[in-house]
């Protein structure tokens, strides 16, 4: 099969020679039945969803409950990011570092080329041009994903600015990231397709120097929507290192005081630590308002005024469904309720609506995420998968900040790090300076969640919530953070804080109510920036006392507040060998600044003896 005999290649709506030659090369390798350029139109979405319903991949939901929305149930083997099959194939192994899987790029290209050979037989090869972030940006980051999955094309319309407008932005000679994806399930003539095609063999591979992504075998979001973690974190972090900016696993939140002054927060939390809930916060303190600019990824660059400005490169929310409800995140529920949403691996109700654990009103009967009957009180397994998702347009969020599409971004006042820890880490701590803040982020540990493979509940170090997403050596990444702090005067840099909403008391009870009440912690942070609030200088940084927090109207015991804020030297002594082990794992590239901060912590602890 040659490119000349593949329908659609000869009518490509572009004169970009490098793009055209790449498309021909991939088509000749993968043997698709046809090539289609995604234009991103609503008509195309309609055709895609109809095709997906006919294939059994999508089920149309009740339009009265969720208009223009669909449910997809994946293969049970294809439900999450596969970190064990995710590779950073830098030219030199040392540049991938100890946190990434590495293979020689030539060897990986050879292996995957053989997997791709004929892999799109019987399928459509979709060409999906996309733009990460507002297209009016000074330096827009563009990409083209080739995929044989209509599920991916439909989801990319929600998650990115894709289609004809992005192709026009690339122009005749613009740079773009090459993102190649296949589910790895070729169809022979007359062969019946699966509702969720995938392959037991999976590779999610990144070539940082050439800015390429090759993905094979998985149809699941993080492995297949290549604009998401693959581009906007792994490849973009390598770009950011080379170009002097930051690509981070962070929400962007706008908090507005009663005086109508806006403060912008960028916050890094590992999966299932309340990132989306905080991004769509409903403050409980009178007079305070919050708006969202993003729930997952922030790209941050220094402006001419020396401040750090953030944009969200995404166009939609790809949120974890279980636990999302009208109490924990009413704004996410309103966003979803507006429709145009793709749900994956949640349960189906008898009236064609969706349900998941944590939603109010458990139905007596459901079809679970595996397609089986599920009965309340009888079926022992969860109805929705723990990593089930909603994919929904950002533009529908009722508290979307007007600046969400501003190519200049917003000036960040606060960088928040957070994690899920039952003990040790207080509710909120302020870093002493930028380098100390980097140390806080570099040493964060969080309990394992369902969003990635691995044992749930064990604590793993997850620096800046970027452990699975750094596109280069973790030691160089820490040094990059330290170096960026020297780009500007300390007074212009965001102030760094660390939060832990998840500390527990006796009997495993959460000490802090969380959700909207977290606005009380953010108010203290704002007051610290404005030099209006007190705090205690502790072993680990500045921590408020109970009287420093605005607790008016909150039903919480003073004992619980004190325990939530406590800094226990014995617990921190237990943490020292864990930090030491982590730094030894980072190896020779650990910056001296991080070792200095660790020694300072040890010395402060020694004085407590």
Swiss-Prot record:
Listed A to Z, the keywords are:
Cytoplasm, Decarboxylase, Gluconeogenesis, GTP-binding, Lyase, Manganese, Metal-binding, Nucleotide-binding
Cofactor binding note of this UniProt entry: Binds 1 Mn(2+) ion per subunit.
Q: Which GO terms describe its cellular component?
A: cytosol
Per UniProt, what is one GO molecular function of this protein? GTP binding
Which residues of the sequence carry a binding annotation for Mn(2+)?
229, 249, 296
* Ligand binding (GTP): 272-277, 389, 420, 515-518
Note the InterPro entries from the entry.
Answer: PEP_carboxykin_GTP_CS (IPR018091), PEP_carboxykinase_C (IPR013035), PEP_carboxykinase_GTP (IPR008209), PEP_carboxykinase_GTP_C (IPR035077), PEP_carboxykinase_GTP_N (IPR035078), PEP_carboxykinase_N (IPR008210)
Task: Write out the annotated subcellular location.
Answer: Cytoplasm
Subunit relationships: Monomer.
Q: Which family does it belong to?
A: Belongs to the phosphoenolpyruvate carboxykinase [GTP] family.
Job description of the protein: Catalyzes the conversion of oxaloacetate (OAA) to phosphoenolpyruvate (PEP), the rate-limiting step in the metabolic pathway that produces glucose from lactate and other precursors derived from the citric acid cycle.
| Xref: PANTHER family | PHOSPHOENOLPYRUVATE CARBOXYKINASE, PHOSPHOENOLPYRUVATE CARBOXYKINASE [GTP]-RELATED
Instruction: Report the protein name in the record.
Output: Phosphoenolpyruvate carboxykinase [GTP]
